[in-house]
């Protein structure tokens, strides 16, 4: 079997893995080396200048000794198997880079014999790629649960980001669908990666302080960053586009390009719809993972029924793509807007509303906190208004220093008034066309969304495009 035949099989086998966007690494080009990592990201991500860049998403092998019920590569599956040699895959990656097909590599694998043996092969591939072929581009590597810590350390020195897939939202479902795995084997490498990153950060900070003659630095604990009013005004005047650094995101005291071990951190993936857990359980799990292991991302992957198994949903079960989308929106609110899971879901209402986004759902459930006066609302309150994002909120704060704002002014600032005008007053004046009833607001927002040019275009494309699976 030649290399391209293997690629056809192993790229297709990797398509169900969602946790492969890049990441926060901004490594400059180096003399004599091939490629560079961009903080803007790859794997069909868009850079600030509009470029779309991709990575090669592939398995080292789809042979696997595990028999996870949901996996197309499980040991009992009747599928064509293939395995790259480490050198073969490394050379293919550089060849694709030189042809401008990709700017990075996402590397995973089925379990060949044991987690340690598989990881050793992945390390051999990445070592050849980095040290012999001098590839300097972005690399995301999967850590297989049960891998020896020394091997995790080694692969973390070669990859920009590591990920350990949690796969299922509860230990009960993991035991039922993945007989070779348990929650401890998944969380143990997560904890090890976290400890190594914290240790390296501490060493880098101590070295930095020592170079400045500082004996000891108290430092500020990590957490939600609440900018000062002066910072907000300055940013509001300067902002021209949406920028993640201006949200309530967690701060890092060490730049990624200073780190040697997994500089872009770690992520995980949770499969949605293969097991009965609610959105309430999933979002609380996500919050715990962010807090305990400082994950950069929790990815959600809507389960696609392609395997007939009594433990899984029927083959004709719809793929829960909208639920996946709502979970991503809720996750975004938790990571960047300082929402907690308890504000979005609860044991009494454990499912996100599929018709409206979670931020609007929260606002409709808390109408007693609205309308918000645009001239004096603080940043954290403005960010809770549907239709106002971090850039818009800072523009409002900067603009209201100069003049009294009207709804026309908000429109010029780029605020989505179709959503936000229901929840705002400008100098004490409410938009007369905005209803005060919860259900009327919901139906109007849904109607506006259906009539949007984006959704019209999407429906037209979906009706004319052949689905791959």
Name these PLM-found stretches.
Residues 55, 68, 107, 164, ...:
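Conserved, mostly hydrophobic/aromatic
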Residues 57-58, 87-98:
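Short, charged beta->alpha transition segments
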Residues 58-87:
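Canonical Radical SAM [4Fe-4S] cluster-binding loop centered on the CxxxCxxC motif
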Residues 90, 113-337, 343:
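Conserved AdoMet/S-adenosylmethionine-binding subsite of the radical SAM
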Residues 399-400:
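Residue-level signature of tetratricopeptide-repeat
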Residues 1-63, 416, 424, 432-460, ...:
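Flexible, acidic/Gly-rich N-terminal and inter-domain linker regions that tether
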